[in-house]
Amino acid sequence: MTERTLILIKPDGVTNGHVGEIIARIERKGLKLAALDLRVADRETAEKHYEEHADKPFFGELVEFITSAPLIAGIVEGERAIDAWRQLAGGTDPVAKATPGTIRGDFALTVGENVVHGSDSPESAEREISIWFPNL
């Protein structure tokens, strides 16, 4: 089934020079880049994006990190795009859960700075795409 999903290459992925390799992995997987935007996220967008974590102690740090430097926001399309992207990304904890060969397994060291984000369901994808790309 063809799907769309939001991807973020977080500030650590941009700052550490991993954008080209991440995009290459997306394309090698057979997924299509439908939108791509380099930007510094504003606080309002970051807070909306992470609203399910608003009551957690790490919320402030999460918002600070995601707004601290440029990131890439994108929409990826393809057959089972959500699962395909999550497979490419690897587990959220890059040491305990992400295997070598995944983006996080290869490039991340901490849960807080784990290089990429991807929607975890069709509902999340729809909500997140509307936050980052309200005109699409």
Swiss-Prot record:
Reaction it catalyzes: a 2'-deoxyribonucleoside 5'-diphosphate + ATP = a 2'-deoxyribonucleoside 5'-triphosphate + ADP; a ribonucleoside 5'-diphosphate + ATP = a ribonucleoside 5'-triphosphate + ADP
Keywords annotated in UniProt: ATP-binding, Cytoplasm, Kinase, Magnesium, Metal-binding, Nucleotide metabolism, Nucleotide-binding, Phosphoprotein, Transferase
Cofactor annotation: Mg(2+)
InterPro entries documented for this protein: NDK-like_dom, NDK-like_dom_sf, Nucleoside_diP_kinase, Nucleoside_diP_kinase_AS
Compartment list: Cytoplasm
Location of the active site: 117 (pros-phosphohistidine intermediate)
Protein family (similarity comment): Belongs to the NDK family.
Record's protein name: Nucleoside diphosphate kinase
Organism: Corynebacterium glutamicum (strain ATCC 13032 / DSM 20300 / JCM 1318 / BCRC 11384 / CCUG 27702 / LMG 3730 / NBRC 12168 / NCIMB 10025 / NRRL B-2784 / 534)
